[in-house]
Amino acid sequence: MSDRLLACATYLSPNEHEAAILAGHSIDVSNGINMEDVAVVSQAFQARGVENLIITMGENGSIAAGKNGIHHTHCVKMEHVADPTAAGDSFVAAFCTGLTAGLPQGEALAFASHTAAITVSRMGAMPSLPTVEEVQQLLVERDYQGFDPAELDALKQ
């Protein structure tokens, strides 16, 4: 990707392998996520004009990095994984929706992770996408403490 194109991105959402290729530096996850590596990768993207980076890392969760610092959320594991189709799409859509609803980056990341978890537990693309109510229910069931799931009620209107 050219620097000119990257400079147009307010948010960029590569997976960990794409981020490593574009930044020229990988993130070590052998003993948990190496946050120093995350900072190096984030700075490489910021130097190329990307304001915010959302890195999906599979079972290692996801990271938001940029002008508001670095936030990590764990992968939300489901008892049954049926189909990964649309997981990335639902993750990015939920992250953007969370930001639009007024959630800070770290909380939008958690909302996105819970949304994608429901998505992978179902078959298909469109049929797997959860409603806000379903994500709120999962947040409550998993005793998520980052924000009150009722804050998402505004999305129902």
Question: What is each of the regions a protein language model found here?
Answer:
Residues 20-23:
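A short acidic, helix-capping loop that chelates divalent metal ions and anchors anionic groups
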Residues 2-5:
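Structural alpha-helical scaffold elements that stabilize or flank donor/cofactor-binding regions
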Residues 7-8, 49:
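Short, structured coil segments at secondary-structure junctions
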Residues 25, 30-157:
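Conserved phosphate-binding/catalytic region of the ribokinase-like
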Residues 8-18:
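Non-cysteine beta-strand/loop elements that form the S-adenosyl-L-methionine
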